[in-house]
Amino acid sequence: MTLSSKSIRRGAVVGALVVGVGTSVAAAAPATTAALHCGIYWGSLPKTAKITETAPMMNVRAGQHACFDRMVVDVRAGGADGYFVHYVDTVRQEGSGFAVPLRGGARLQVTVVAPAYDNYRQTYRPANRSELVNVAGWQTFRQIAWAGSYEGQSTIGLGVRARLPFRVFVLQGPGAGSRFVIDVAHRW
């Protein structure tokens, strides 16, 4: 074997390695891209569930996650499962129809079939109707405000950064209660 054929063979091996590494990087790119978007496929159309049970709501809380912000409405024993959540131009108060001002580029009206009262006694009384949970500095949520409870349902205004994908589901427990969960993605 001559010096030039060794050089050619060495060049071919190095070239094959470079092509192989390039192929590995290209193959890994889609997985990385999918991970960046968190696999969210929820969409932004209205979400609804029919009522099969109802019980009074007890609390509203929220949390931040890597891919979304989450709001939870806690419901007392007996559980509840009916809801209607959708983007609106203006969130309206239950009963009066007055506008509920909200910060953010888009507004979600969250209506749960769970009154904030039981036998004429309040089961949920927010300390500050305009700020149910402090979400200052959060990635997606801008404001969570109380819009009232009337005729067996309660409405919450959720101000968000922009019209983003969201999902809604009901979890049973802890105990005999249930939780309405609203997740809004950080991005599309």
Predicted regions and their residues:
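Secretory targeting and sorting signals
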Residues: 1-32
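Short linear recognition/processing motifs and adjacent strand/loop elements at protein termini
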Residues: 3, 30-188
